[in-house]
Amino acid sequence: MTHIRKTHPLFKIINQSFIDLPTPSNISAWWNFGSLLGVCLVIQTLTGLFLAMHYTSDTITAFSSVTHICRDVNYGWLIRYIHANGASMFFMCLYLHVGRGLYYGSYLYLETWNIGVILLLATMATAFMGYVLPWGQMSFWGATVITNLLSAIPYIGTDLVEWIWGGFSVDKATLTRFFAFHFILPFIITALAMTHLLFLHETGSNNPLGLSSDMDKIPFHPYYTIKDILGLLIMIATLVTLVLFSPDLLGDPDNYTPANPLSTPPHIKPEWYFLFAYAILRSIPNKLGGVVALVCSILVLMIMPLLHTAKQRSMMFRPLSQLLFRLLVANLLILTWIGGQPVEHPFIIIGQVASISYFSIILILMPLAGILENHLMKL
């Protein structure tokens, strides 16, 4: 008798996606991050739901409600810190997942890649709005600075900012709508993630060689379910260690001070996972130019398929491209460091050089390396 998982309309979909899915036999641990991101999304949605039960989105009580969660709610401190540090794990996995895609040429699956970039943008928007909710100093000033960037848009900028604020400054209306969006976006992200998987399963997974693996596929379960559980255990262990030993390691001390519109913090900066983009924004003296560079730093991923000049898909056998990829990673780490530094010499010039090299590596050097490697293959 055919197993129920192959005949039942609902189980059949799950079976084709996670159990009998034909998977390349040679995919490495770098292919683990998709499932880890799924787990992160579930963790964030559940902890967020429990936090929302006790949180109030009002400027007067928001900060107090977060304090109340940590002090009075059963394991509220644990839920809050899992949620806060879970976001860091989410972005760590996201960046490694995107890096894997760049290194192994996964961006040539156009639909999957483009939905992935939209997912990245949606996650960044969600995280930004979530950071505003505790209504600490960095929440308030971060919201003020980042939303104010939209005023650089010609003609409609000022009206657009006031429309987003719901008034003439970041206030109760802003906090309420940010809470509403922060609540709804994860469900949109879940729908996008399903679409991402749908398109991925149309083509099948890429593999480290970048070659077709149709002649050598194995079922996802038990091989990759077991393999993914190892990555999951490592991630959970890291998250639990972070939450229980140093929950505020990645946070900002300024956010333990209630929001005060009359007192600006000495250094306004976002969470660590946005620092690279923040450094690019600050490296351009012109406001509109900075905003354009900020948006392009993420949207440049959309045009990666157009910049692929090599005859080989993966970078596995392309030493020049490998070198440039490693330079790009180092460059992003430098940008992350600069984003957290004050705007003064020598950090300004380092940020400008790193920003120029970021775009140069992606837009100029990598395509040139691909062309050069094509010629080297003929020798």
Curated annotation (Swiss-Prot):
The chain crosses the membrane at residues 33-53, 77-98, 113-133, 178-198, 226-246, 288-308, 320-340, 347-367. It comes from the Eukaryota. Its main location: mitochondrion. A ubiquinone binds at residue 201. Heme b b566 binds at residues 97, 196. CDD domains: cytochrome_b_C (cd00290), Cytochrome_b_N (cd00284). It is a multi-pass membrane protein. The keyword Nucleotide-binding does not apply. It is found in: Mitochondrion inner membrane. PROSITE patterns: CYTB_CTER, CYTB_NTER. The cytochrome bc1 complex contains 11 subunits: 3 respiratory subunits (MT-CYB, CYC1 and UQCRFS1), 2 core proteins (UQCRC1 and UQCRC2) and 6 low-molecular weight proteins (UQCRH/QCR6, UQCRB/QCR7, UQCRQ/QCR8, UQCR10/QCR9, UQCR11/QCR10 and a cleavage product of UQCRFS1). This cytochrome bc1 complex then forms a dimer. This is Cytochrome b. The gene is MT-CYB.
